Amino acid sequence: MQFTRGLLALVILIAPALAPAEECEVELFVLGAGQDAGAPHIGYPDDPAWADPALGQTATSIAVVDHVAGERFLFEATPHVTRQLQLLDTLAPADGPGLGLDGVFLTHAHIGHYAGLMYFGREGAGADGIPVFVMPRFAAFLQGNGPWSQLVKLENIVIQPLAAETPVQASKGIHVTPLTVPHRDEFSETVGFVIVTNASKTLFLPDLDSWDEWAQASGIDLATRVVELDHLFVDATFFQDGELTGRDMSEIPHPRVKDTMERLSGLSPELRQKVRFIHYNHTNPIRFPASPESALVSARGFDVARAGDRLCLAP
């Protein structure tokens, strides 16, 4: 399978629609790869993206498109969903009118992962019955709290409850299974998704507290998952401790990129290349492709997901 690096986001947004790099029945598109608030970041006046918008980043989101069925599925509705759907329309145009979304899968109720639902309402797209796949607590949160409850009442969205480790058929060629993971669960569960086609299994896991905690809860460690899966998009919020000035980062759970690479250092190059880092904070230097840290990730045999990337999941 071929993983094709996308063009710069600005170029993508103004370019004509691009055909898949190869004949591909099911294709994954990276629409954003940043942490919830993106970059430039609120309250961070020194971010270079203020002066150079090309250095900005949107919150993490992917789309999976079944080209045979003509169906598109969004994973995460971020605060940047307007720009991200425009990017998707450029890369894989919808067949009909409206947003062209046949379903939205949400991992958890933190702002960068669901706040974009607000644009589906009457003040924005005025969407009609978009299926939104969420875990039970998350479903109750959306149904019982405004403004999300208005989206449900007006049927801009239709809640589709999920169950842990129970696959749902998104389209004829795509099945999606939620896996619960440890994270701050103030308003909802937190899950990662395994996206299964007839040719591959892909893990989308932008947020979790600890690889060790997940392994203890699930009985499966990270290295085993790398062996069993074909592609993994995993939490890269921080590169290493010390990124946040004046903060004790031991109190901020997230696997560090350096730790994840070290954990998997004993795997073969063929296995390590399955892993792609996503959901990086504005302080994480891998957000810059030319940084020494990005070069280190590549040298260690891993990859960094970037907006505009595309990956064939079923040739």
Go through the PLM ranges and name each one.
Residues 1-7:
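Bacterial N-terminal signal peptides that target proteins for export
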Residues 8-9, 19:
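Cleavable N-terminal signal peptides
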Residues 14-16, 20:
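N-terminal signal peptide c-region/cleavage motif recognized by signal peptidases
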Residues 22-90, 94-96, 159-225, 309-315:
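Core dinuclear metal-dependent hydrolase active-site scaffold
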Residues 74-78, 100-113, 117, 133-135, ...:
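Active-site neighborhood of phospho(di)ester-bond hydrolases with catalytic His/Asp-centered motifs
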Residues 137-146:
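A short, active-site helix/loop in glycosyltransferases that binds the activated sugar's phosphate group
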Residues 199-201, 209-310:
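Cap/insert and terminal regions of metallo-dependent hydrolase folds
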